[in-house]
């Protein structure tokens, strides 16, 4: 789950990696979920522009609060199949780092 904004340069820099990860692991049950608070019309345009192939939900105070009141963006949580947060990253994180956590989780049918 990636908390981001269209005006955030590090957020924008991460998106191609998320697109690649979504494409690579979708058939194993993996989904990137973006969370943005700018509103559907802004986000839809941005998603088309960057070729985002994963869902983006509109954030609200409850969603942000559920994840510990996000204080910086991008902030990304890797969540396992049970819904447990495995790890969190604040600031730009590269695709290889995300994959190093995601790939083993997908191999483990319990996690």
Enumerate the language-model features and the residues they cover.
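Hydrophobic beta-strand core positions in alpha/beta domains
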Residues: 2, 34, 77-78
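Conserved redox-active cysteine motifs that mediate thiol-disulfide chemistry
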Residues: 3-20
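Short pre-active-site segment immediately N-terminal to redox-active cysteine/selenocysteine motifs
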Residues: 3-7, 39, 72
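Pocket-edge positions in alpha/beta enzyme catalytic cores
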Residues: 7-10, 35, 90
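Conserved protein kinase catalytic core
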Residues: 8, 42, 86
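Conserved segment of the thioredoxin-like fold in thiol-based oxidoreductases
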Residues: 13, 20-61, 73
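Thiol/disulfide oxidoreductase modules built on the thioredoxin-like
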Residues: 45-53, 58-104
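Non-globular targeting/processing and membrane-anchoring segments
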Residues: 108-111
